[in-house]
Amino acid sequence: MENRFKGRTAFVTGGSRGIGKAIVEQFAQEGANVAIVDLDQEALTKTEAELKEKGYPVYAKLASVTNQEEIALAMKEVNEAFGSIDILVNNAGVTRDNMLFKMTDEDWTTVIDVHLKGAFYTARAAQEYMTKKKYGRIINISSTSALGNRGQSNYSTAKAGLQGFTKTLAIEIGKFGITVNAVAPGFIETDMTKATAARIGVSFDDLIGNAVAQIPVARSGKPKDISNAILFFADEKSSFVSGQVLYVAGGPVN
């Protein structure tokens, strides 16, 4: 495996399952030091053990992206452990789907806080280290839901907000050698989409089948499809690509 990230440190939020875990694993396989923060202790411990068993340098910490003190401490510890924070992937996410008239204040606030406040806290903490090094890569995970999706007014708003956040940061901190981009997944087979199937009362296979019927490449997405896109933006060779949103959805989106 090519060690294109050797000597680099990738800090991934929500990195113990699904898309996040695929991102962490691919960074590790390609030579990066990896740092994971997550709220799922069981998954975090399992992922950390798997990576260490393979000899990969890894930092794992139970922390909430909505707690700026926890994030600041994690960043400090990662910098002390590995000597830099070069890549930030804002992957942590949550859904609380419901129609507007049924959506509670907590449903709204939880989703907005995890995605937007979380990305704000992590990016603000990371840029302190990146600007000193005159190098950095920040990649935010948006979604095709940013374009609007029934029953997801909170999630759609958060994911659209991340796109605006991405473009603004690209303008603000580009002069410090930092690029900021976003990846917007379409239908990806994860625990989150399994939960969606359960919520609407259909089998996961049926949910996949319905999604695939509308995807031009005639297949569903896998976490590796997203990690491939993330690593493209994280690569040193992508230094002239910033402020972009890449839809990884198996076809054009409207």
Role assignments for model-derived ranges:
Residues 16-17:
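Conserved glycine-rich cofactor-binding loop
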Residues 41-42, 62-73, 105, 225:
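The beta1-alpha1 cofactor-binding region of Rossmann-like NAD(H)/NADP(H)-dependent oxidoreductases
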Residues 72, 95-109, 132, 151-154, ...:
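Conserved mid-core segment of classical short-chain dehydrogenase/reductases
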Residues 128, 171-175, 239:
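Alpha-helical segment proximal to the catalytic Tyr-Lys
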Residues 99-100, 107-112, 138, 207, ...:
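Substrate-binding pocket helix/loop in short-chain dehydrogenase/reductase
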Residues 231, 242-254:
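Short C-terminal tail/terminal secondary-structure segment
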Residues 123, 158, 166:
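Active-site helix of classical SDR
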